[in-house]
């Protein structure tokens, strides 16, 4: 087992009982793969598959002109080089995008030629706007801010059958319906009404009998009846009627006459119900025809029309009822055989026949007209319009598309693979005629498709078949970034197509080129709108690495084409059994979106159709193999799947006689030999955030939900600290989120400082002729979207050997490459003077003093200088009537220095704006003329620090418009950036040269020369001393006798000069980017951004939380000496209320505290050993005991060298980190074993701590009195987070501020500098106390009495404290409102 560079330094002891069969997949794969499939940027144009952009283009092109003489074909597209990299885009507020160019071919046909001949062909590349690119971490940079496109969970296209659950009709009758949902196009619904007529509707419009649709499709009534019915045959004689007997059809009927066999024996007596036994008897007796009374025939419907053969007169139409008069007519016309429809009330309803009766439309064309009138009411139906509309509804590829998914789902549901025994004969006939349908097929509907849906719906009504469950994940699919972007792109292209069609006719005559035809505006605006302001495109939650990852793995049911919050019921939001392993049942927001926004489970991924699938281990011959299959929710229901915690023996066979398993989405116990699959991991069912909660299995689900959500709000602390009790997935999350820096290639660290790491790559990993250097520029003090601080710190030293993928620098909230959201705090569960009442948290002053929860927040403040009508605004230091103290920290350009500490109200950037001219008196004009311009016509509009903010200036950026001269500060910033870049290139060049000259030395040392510099003679050998005496570039002048070596020397010289040329061009490119003007909004000349770093210590009012949903607000910070302390004098860091645990049922926190206590105890033991300068062997033995002599995963301590063991021990002094994976973690016995190892009974420290029974509770002493508390207290270490709800951001007080326009009352909210609302109930309170003066003041001068409040101000200034209350403005508003209702209301003043 090999450990990475950082793992060696800190091993996590894992309590996992099961070997991991499959690694957790790359967590951002879904986003990256989806967008890569959309762009196909790295695939050559001729090898691209028909997905994404390629599919969008090929679905819209070719575009043919109306006359058909010109057409525009799509050849290929390519994405250019992005002009700026991600970092530059973020700084300049640009979109990180690449230009899209499309090669199109314009073909013009010769109009005059008799047969089609091509007149000319023009091919050209057309620019189609910019396509945003995804950063390597799965986000997009749009206008300088990072955004995420959230995947959408929507109803899969296909056909769905459901019923109304008896809610529509008062009788509670189930009304069945079917709905065909295409990917794009019109919805087609079929539904029964309470009278059992079958209707259809298009796009939820007015309903019409389904037979109208069938007639419009070209079916006659006879064909319709033949499709949906079996026939009964009757032979009509002069006397009596004979019936061809099909015994099966009589089952359950009551015999209306005696049924006799050939010998005249009674099989079924009259008025008896016919049973299965009777049917068997009839089949045995072999009767084929029986004579029946005429009443038996009356009332049945004819299967086909009947024509008098002699006269040609129509006697009866299809579906007519047989009456006595009709029978007489038939006998007259000599008709001796008729077919009637076989129907009964039980399982062969006559719905279609009844529906045909209420439909009075005679033929196909009239049916189409009826549909046209329903779709376009009030428009005159011309023949072309009618046909075009009907064809366009479901049969035109441009208008209607089921998509591959839709077709697959449709065929699976409407055409069953195997026909069941109970299927009716007419349906069996239909399926045999159509034949089996695979998963592929056209995107439009065919007549057979529509018939199949009606047939399945009728069978449902007949009581055969099941309805669909809409919330089943086999019926809901994921639309990821790529697909959403493709839809937007296609929509833009369709708009382009319309315009191009118009212009193509011009192209025939005007000799236009392709780029004259195509206007790319609609495409680029559709894309811009999608990425900039659509619902799926969200401002990335960047509080900490976990919130980034979770945001990218989010799946939302909201958005265009999805649900809305108001309409979504309970069923959609509920956890469904198919969520198992696909969507997390825990992590979802609290509030109106609960259940509509979900998170992907750890191992889940989407298949080619967009359905979520989850991995399972295959079980063959009772043996669990390591072969893994991904199953979607549709496939999963057919298998028996065992849970991951089933006990297995050495060979991978199940130990128990009964295994807990799932079959058909139900949980059951099954025999091992019936099991076909097994879960891959116990944590398979939860999401990333939930899998970070240790002992999740001991927490109530509601609290786990809060815990998962609150981890995403944890603010990165100044010094991150790994959790003592983790779940083992922390490293994966940190690495996959992209916050830490990982080595791209293996190598040796050549140079490290706080902002860059230079690695000399191993020769075997560097490609030939390539620069063997990796330079990692670290992100320093950068603002995240949530104003938290992103800062990377190197973990390596010069000379360290790295492998590919090793973590070499920590980012925000990571510690040695592991996610570290909070701090480990020594916690006691006890009440303390009421300060932890109702979840309040009491913390020690030491926590503040050690800066444990100090976080840095970065605020961006910007100011723009515009060109106004009165003249340009100016950024300057020269501002009148500002004291020198205010201007003291501005440089000569008027911009504050970096490093200045500023308070609210301080000037950051001086700016003046021209004021409007005032009319001058002649005297003033004269003075003006003499003394020149006065400074009074500008007003001070400087950028100041907003109220309630203070901090240190850490960065300033100046952007200047093209063509405007830069000030000294802007020039200096550019010079600094260039110097940094030059340093990078110089380092690269230095290492490349060192490497190259090292190779040259090895190549030519000891070789025979034929001459060279410093009088090297022919035949002399080249020595090391000789080479050292030469300048390195002179080595190339040495002439060697060995031609092969000489050639290699030549090659090295060429590659070196090539590298130098490349570096020079890179530098020039960078210089060009920096010195060209910046793109600024119109009218803006200059923009200055100032970044302030604000240090926030923890203080009362801040919100803190554990990982188990145990949240609270800091109530008091207590001096260290007053905190409860242990017998050895260790004071507590945090005191929590024990009443917060039992009712909330999150016991996980107690177990975490116990295990954390053990972790710290072990750390102290290791620390003591180091202090006593123990030998490496002794440390190794102890580590073996900790890691391998207990339950859980064993670690390979033997593979570490002695130095590595000591290094590891040093890092373990603060506590041995544990991993307790979800559902597979430490048991009570494991925790006790660890506590015994941490606090052995013979250790003096154990005796000193005065443990109660067990080692989880100790006697605590009151810091104020020194007395012991009367009962033992649970203490231990808990990982506690500080959440992004800081009192500094919420605290706010209003002095005189803005007022609302109409009511003249103060505004509300911190952003508006508003006041606190004094509402109706507060007024009642004052009334109840009889505080009349306070009440008057509240309702008048403090609120909306305009004259009164100015009066009060005057009085206070004069020093009189008196109030003259007037008329509140809201009363005037009320009067005006009443007057608007035409009621004249006035105040009578006496």
UniProtKB/Swiss-Prot annotation:
Tell me the lineage of the source organism: Bacteria, Pseudomonadati, Pseudomonadota, Betaproteobacteria, Nitrosomonadales
Q: Which InterPro entries match?
A: DNA-dir_RNA_pol_bsu_ext_1_sf, DNA-dir_RNA_pol_bsu_external_1, DNA-dir_RNA_pol_su2, DNA-dir_RNAP_su2_dom, DNA-dir_RNAP_su2_hyb_sf, RNA_pol_bsu_bac, RNA_pol_bsu_CS, RNA_pol_bsu_protrusion
Source species? Methylobacillus flagellatus (strain ATCC 51484 / DSM 6875 / VKM B-1610 / KT)
Q: Which family does it belong to?
A: Belongs to the RNA polymerase beta chain family.
Which PROSITE patterns does this one have? RNA_POL_BETA
Q: Which GO terms describe its molecular function?
A: DNA binding; DNA-directed RNA polymerase activity; ribonucleoside binding
A GO BP entry: DNA-templated transcription
What HAMAP family would the database entry show?
RNApol_bact_RpoB (MF_01321)
Its UniProt entry gives the catalysed reaction(s) as: RNA(n) + a ribonucleoside 5'-triphosphate = RNA(n+1) + diphosphate
Mind telling me which GO cellular component terms the entry cites? DNA-directed RNA polymerase complex
This chain's protein is named: DNA-directed RNA polymerase subunit beta
- Identify the enzyme class: transferase
Q: Which gene encodes it?
A: rpoB
Q: Which domain of life is it from?
A: Bacteria
Q: What does the UniProt keyword field contain?
A: DNA-directed RNA polymerase, Nucleotidyltransferase, Transcription, Transferase
Task: Quote the SUPFAM superfamilies the UniProt record gives.
Answer: beta and beta-prime subunits of DNA dependent RNA-polymerase (SSF64484)
Enzyme Commission number(s) of this protein = 2.7.7.6
**What does the record give as the function of this protein?**
DNA-dependent RNA polymerase catalyzes the transcription of DNA into RNA using the four ribonucleoside triphosphates as substrates.
Subunit info here reads: The RNAP catalytic core consists of 2 alpha, 1 beta, 1 beta' and 1 omega subunit. When a sigma factor is associated with the core the holoenzyme is formed, which can initiate transcription.
